[in-house]
């Protein structure tokens, strides 16, 4: 959008990226990643010949949907009338056909706030994020919920057992050269995001 504001030739590209945002939001929210019981997004493992398996391990991956937030200011719509018209058509089409539409809030006609996460799910994700026995630590946000310290995640896939446990220091296994980065420590780059 920023480029399109300065060069109208990119208006079609901005529209395409907006449509892709909507389709990604639909995939995240409508295709088995959200768990209503745990109120969290999980990875979904698809194995040929089997039903998709939701990997109910609370990792920072389930929080990354919070990163995709954007505000579209009224002045952008004013400078890009075709973009505004296409977005309006796309929204009407999806709503008319009962298709997913991402969390969108408008403030007095001035700006549009877009988020991959619907408001009601956002509240639950923030509860996980800000809970000291889950993701929040003195040093930042953990990569794996501290919940898994006493409750390791176990899954059996094709007869092989796998376990993931909160392990924020030196790894207790030799996998990946003893690297435990996915098992609880704080990663500054992700905390910055």
Can you name each region flagged by the protein language model?
Residues 1-193:
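Acidic, mature catalytic/reactive cores of soluble proteins
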